[in-house]
């Protein structure tokens, strides 16, 4: 199927898109800010127009899409333990009016801790955005070693971790709790009561495309479980 898309793009170019259509703030933040930060770093050492890139923890793939559309990347393989990227064709259609996502983007669901090295050609650059705080401590060294083995000699690895656990909002729960360092000041049970009692909308920039899958109460439980699973090291 991918070769058909590549042929289409060779003949007619990328599908038309229009950033003026963007209405979702989560999309805007990752399509603009996150992509610009990644490109500022990766683009300073690699030519993204020719580089083979791997995104470890690609999420919904919005940042990858922006790197292709706004910065000229031509080959990005995204991997994640969840399948949020499967929503990208719909998201791109709704937010950009795109009929199809670029052929240079590929995605894969992986098992936590499963090695990637040796399964695909070596890459020029690896990027990871807000992922490693979710990796369990005993998996950190093996995963870093595995990713290093995925890089060509002289390749580059861009890693972003935010927020850091011991920072004011390191719980990743700011969408529900605006008290700085609250996760370090109260018990887990007390913190959950704050999250559970929250009423009203949450910041649009913090409302990802998985929210609708869970519903209001289900999403609270999901993000709180994500907080509980943080490695508390990064």
Question: What is each model feature region?
Answer:
Residues 115-126:
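A short acidic, Gly/Pro-enriched loop at the edge of an enzyme's catalytic core
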Residues 124-138:
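A short SAM/SAH-binding and catalytic strip from SAM-dependent methyltransferases
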Residues 225-234:
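Short alpha-helix
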Residues 6-45:
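Class I SAM-dependent methyltransferase Rossmann-like catalytic core
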Residues 50-59, 158-201:
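Conserved class I S-adenosyl-L-methionine
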Residues 141-153:
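A short glycine-rich, Lys/Arg-flanked "PGG" loop and its adjoining helix->strand segment in the class I
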């Amino acid at each position: 199927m991918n070769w058909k898309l590549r042929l289409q793009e060779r003949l007619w170019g990328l599908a038309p898109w229009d950033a003026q259509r963007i209405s979702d703030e989560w999309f805007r933040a990752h399509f603009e800010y996150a992509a610009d930060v990644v490109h500022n770093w990766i683009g300073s050492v690699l030519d993204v127009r020719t580089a083979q890139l791997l995104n470890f923890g690609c999420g919904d793939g919005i940042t990858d899409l922006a790197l292709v559309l706004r910065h000229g990347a031509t080959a990005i393989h995204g991997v994640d333990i969840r399948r949020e990227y499967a929503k990208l064709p719909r998201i791109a259609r709704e937010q950009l009016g795109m009929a199809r996502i670029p052929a240079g983007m590929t995605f894969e669901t992986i098992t936590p801790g499963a090695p990637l090295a040796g399964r695909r050609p070596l890459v020029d650059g690896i990027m990871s955005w807000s992922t490693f705080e979710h990796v369990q401590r005993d998996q950190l060294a093996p995963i870093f070693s595995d990713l290093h083995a995925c890089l060509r000699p002289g390749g580059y690895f861009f890693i972003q971790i935010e927020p850091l656990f011991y920072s004011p909002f390191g719980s990743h729960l700011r969408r529900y709790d605006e008290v700085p360092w609250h996760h370090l000041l109260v018990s887990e049970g007390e913190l959950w009561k704050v999250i559970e009692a929250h009423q009203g909308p949450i910041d649009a920039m913090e409302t990802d495309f998985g929210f609708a899958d869970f519903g209001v109460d289900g999403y609270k439980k999901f993000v709180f479980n994500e907080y509980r699973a943080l490695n508390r090291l990064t």
